[in-house]
Amino acid sequence: MKNLSLAALFTLALTACGGGGSSGDGSAASAPSSPVPPAGTADFATRCAQPGVLRCVGFDSASDLAGTWGDNSGSLAGASTPVLDPTVKASGASSLKFTIPSNSPADTSGSYFTNFSADLQTQFSANAEFYVQWRQRFSPEFLNTVFTGGGGWKQAIIGAGDKPGCNAATSSNGLCTSSCTALETVVQNTFQRGFAQMYNSCTGSSSHGAFNPFEEPFGGDFKLQNARPSPFCLYSQTNTTPKTSFSPGTCIGYFPNEWMTFQVKIKTGPRVNDEWTNSFVTLWIAREGQPSQLAITWGPYALTAASPGEDLKFGKVWLLPYNTGKSSAQTHPTGFTWYDELIISRTRIADPR
């Protein structure tokens, strides 16, 4: 990555755990064809009943948020606290609402987390495949604010699951995993560019550094959503005045006041030392009422696996708008983002109805 020196840009801008990414010198990912999610649509209950589903969270009950650090699922507070919102929802009784207050630091809103299974027995390591789908809504204030110092707010972190024995009493013994793990695979509005991007790992591994962005070299440029059709979603488009990421560029952006759908597929390959080699990561995005579109297809790639002795496995998802580097000195409009219909599955998940 010589022409634009993105490695330097990422290192300078995003340094905290859970931040954006510094590009390593790992696998140069190509963009093999990847099928779109299955034809047809389904409501939340129908999607939850499909074969392979491991966990569904509708954010319809106070019990969904009741857990805390050391529990199987729950929420953690930041400058504000996640709450259920019965007035804005994709389905059911309520949704999960995050508030981004004025003059808030990086942890603007806290986080929600859940393991893939209640007994911690369903986790994924080498030669495995799983999917995570959620719906998300954004207020105009949240999308339109450029947050001073912010490296870009996150949407979801898919990372290491807790180990058997994790509870509030044992949480300091290494059995409970935080959002910042070697495995983490993250969807983020990197550099506040206005569209979803992805990166891997809070630590790095043999072939690449920490926060390794999924950016495909393209001549003297980079594809940031590398599965988009011509004229593509390019780094250079983010630096024009005005920006051309969305026209003529084909980046899939965020849209206010509608329930967008995001689905991530992770397919791990065989373990080689501290990596799962020949792995693939896929991201689909859909606007409300429209079919999913392929945004990112990344691989073959060496996903960080941590050392074999750590025995970390994918098994936990975090939902959060954490924004590394965000200045608490900035006065800005209060923003909001909502989540609903979280599904974790062994098989691809249909689009919402």
Where are these predicted regions, by residue range?
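C-terminal motif of bacterial Sec signal peptides marking the signal peptidase cleavage site
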Residues: 14-16
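Low-complexity, Ser/Thr/Pro/Gly-rich disordered linker/stalk regions
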Residues: 31-353
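Ser/Thr-rich, Pro/Gly/Ala-heavy low-complexity intrinsically disordered linkers and tails
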Residues: 1, 23-38
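Sec-dependent signal peptide recognition
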Residues: 1-9
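Bacterial signal peptide processing site
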Residues: 18-22
